[in-house]
Every structure is written in C-alpha cells, then in structure tokens.
Amino acid sequence: MAEYKNYTLNFGPVHPAAHGVLRLILELDGENVVRADPHVGLLHRGTEKLAEFKPYNQSIGYMDRLDYVSMMCNEHAYVMAIEKLLQLEVPERAKYIRVMFAEMTRILNHLLWVAACGIDLGAMTVFLYAFRVREDLFDCYEAVSGARMHAAYFRPGGVARDLPTQMPQYQKTRFTSKRKAKKLNEPRQGSMLDFLDHFVVDFEKSLDEIDTLLTDNRLWKQRTVDIGTVTAERAKELGFTGPMLRGSGVAWDLRKTQPYEVYHKLEFDIPIGANGDCYDRYLVRMAEMRESNKLIKQCVDWLRANPGPVLSDNHKVAPPKRNAMKNNMEELIHHFKLFSEGYCTTEGEVYVGTEHPKGEFGVYIKSDGANKPYRLKMRAPGFAHISAMDELLSGHMLADTPAIISTIDVVFGDVDR
C-alpha cells in the first residue's frame, strides 16, 4: 500500500504592488495547512541604517516609503520623536492638521485593504468603489504637498505649509469629457476645508455602499467567519496591535490610552470585535473608517474657526519664509545650512508610538548630540502579525490562506525596512 506524506508548497512571493513580497512555505496534508513558515526580508532596503547617516530633517522622505499606503502616519511618529528630543512646542493649528491628515491616511489604508481583500475573496466591485473614493483623498495630499503619495508634509515643529485656499481642478482630456470634469470640480471650487465638508458627507454614503455589498453577503461571511480566530489573551501574548488586537475584543488604541497631539480633545469611539476572526477584523476596520470620518469633520470645524501658525517659530529647526529667503542673504544662508547640515539635538533616547492604521508604529531614537541619530529603530506593527502566521493558518484549508493574509493587512515596506 502506498505511503501518504505531507507535501510542501511555496506560497509567494509576489510583486510588492500586489500583496507584498511574502514567501510562505506551507506544509500541506491534502488541502489542510499543517505548518506555515513565513520568510521575510525580501524588501529590505536598510532604512534604519540610511537614516543614521543623514541629518534628521533629510530622513522624512524615507518614512513615507516604509508602509507605502499609510504615508503620513509614518512621518507622524518620526517627527514627534524628534520633537520629543528637542522638547519642541508645536502650534495648535499644526496639531489639528496632522490629526486630520493622519485620519485621512487611515481611511486611505483601510479602503485599499477592503479593496484588496475583496479581490482575494472574489468581490471585484468593492475594489472599484474603494478606489473611486481614494482619489479624493489623494487630491488633498496633492494640494498640500504636490505629491499624491509620498508627501513629506509633516515637519519637526509642525507641517510644511498651511492648508490651501484652492483645490486641484480636473481638466478636459481624452479620458475626461468637459462635462465630467465640470461635475468633478463642483466640490473643488472652494478651499480644502470646503472640499472636506463635502467629502465627509459623501464618504458616509460610499461606506454604506461597501457595507451593503459585503457585510451581510452570504459568500463573504462563509469565507471570513470563524477563519483565523485569535482569542483576546492570545492576541496580547503575540504582541498584536491595531485592528488585529481590537478584532479580538481588546479596546486598546493609543489615541485613547496614551493620547498624543489633540486626540484627547476630540470625540470618537474604539470599535472592537467579539470573536477575533477575519469577519470581526473586517467589521472593526469598517467602523474605524466611520470614526475617522467623524474626526476629520471635527478637525475641519476647528481649523475653520482658528487660523494661526502651522510651524514652530524656533529658527533652529524651522526654515525661513520663502519670500524672505529670496530677498535676504542671511535668510538664504540659514535655509542652506538648515537643509544641508541640519540641526543637533540633545543627548538622550526617546520612543514615540502612534496608532498607525495597521497597529502601533513606534520610532526609537538614540542621540549622541550630533545632527544625525546614533541609532534609529522602528517598530513595524506588521512584524508581530506575520510572526503569528503559523498559528493563524494551521488547521485551515489552503483556500483560507489568502483570506487570513488579507485580514492581517501587512505591507512589507515597514516589516522589512
């Protein structure tokens, strides 16, 4: 009689634009996963070491490229760590702008997640709905920085510039008719704050559409309910954070438990799951988008009523005004030295953790008093989640593997660094 043996299957890696360069070596008993061995490091770019050879203000651009779908949230933790080292005060208006863009980034991340997860499980329509909404938020990125993704907008001491009084306009092209461009430009006639007033109303309707497509969909629930279950206690032991932890029923969110910036002045709830499965993680992220929408609305209302500076007046870290730089040699020299040599910080070490869309993103900086960090270490939320891959996949069918990987929501830019 023939002897039956388990066999090994290489799952991935795929292109970074797909699910990322994860290589899983699966041991299968028929269609059942017996063991999963994740291999990481295929997108390692040496970001931490690169940052140790550059002045503090020249490494902000690297942060955007860590988790490249949550760009400004990466910048946020980094600039807050520098501010903590320098004991730098940030203007109140800049704090509200940062929080507003951090919540926009959370929505961008979760929309991409639900779009990709939908495709993995056969729901193509969700992808189209989600990307339609993401375009509006990318327009906001473009309006403040000129870039649709890698903005480098957050700066130590505040943000690069105040909110614009006009939004980018669509133009007639061979792909966009004059009539369509006019319709798209209707909410873009005023300032960014006017545009966001329109957005928060329309976004609720867009979320309702996605909700209708997925939440009670029989096939969606069959693919996600009781799949990849993690208990609350086990999630804490594994070092889960973010929606992975809250999906298991643990109400841990750094915006509430360790408030930073102006989150303590804003009203929002922490959505949690009950069962810790893929379906609960989906529900948590959907609810988080609604909470982020509320936070954006509160920030818009405050910013409209409270004009003011958006960058610290500490000339050690803040560049001169552009007009002054063009008319005054001393200001030009100041600008040149600031962006070529940077600035020195006090000796010491700091850690700053922020509530990233994927979990706790942390930046640890050890300074020896120079103009560049002696050591820079980043805590990627996805690393702990990938480390639990064997436990999450074991006992499930091979067809459940894409569902579990999707609901982890891992991007290897920050895991591999």
Swiss-Prot record:
Coiled coil, from the record: none
Gene Ontology CC: one annotated term: plasma membrane
SUPFAM superfamilies attached to this UniProt entry: HydB/Nqo4-like (SSF56762)
Name of the coding gene: nuoD
Enzyme Commission code(s) on record: 7.1.1.-
PROSITE patterns hit by this protein: COMPLEX1_49K
Catalytic activity: a quinone + NADH + 5 H(+)(in) = a quinol + NAD(+) + 4 H(+)(out)
Primary location recorded for the protein, binned into one broad class: membrane
Membrane topology: Peripheral membrane protein
Compartments in which it is found: Cell inner membrane
Record Pfam families: Complex1_49kDa
Gene Ontology MF terms: NAD binding; NADH:ubiquinone reductase (non-electrogenic) activity; quinone binding
Name of the molecule in the record: NADH-quinone oxidoreductase subunit D
Stored InterPro entries: NADH_Q_OxRdtase_suD (IPR001135), NADH_UbQ_OxRdtase_49kDa_CS (IPR014029), NDH1_su_D/H (IPR022885), NiFe-Hase_large (IPR029014)
Keyword NAD among record annotations: yes
Subunit-level organization: NDH-1 is composed of 14 different subunits. Subunits NuoB, C, D, E, F, and G constitute the peripheral sector of the complex.
Keywords carried by this UniProt record: Cell inner membrane, Cell membrane, Membrane, NAD, Quinone, Translocase, Transport, Ubiquinone
Family that this chain belongs to: Belongs to the complex I 49 kDa subunit family.
Free-text function comment from the UniProt entry: NDH-1 shuttles electrons from NADH, via FMN and iron-sulfur (Fe-S) centers, to quinones in the respiratory chain. The immediate electron acceptor for the enzyme in this species is believed to be ubiquinone. Couples the redox reaction to proton translocation (for every two electrons transferred, four hydrogen ions are translocated across the cytoplasmic membrane), and thus conserves the redox energy in a proton gradient.
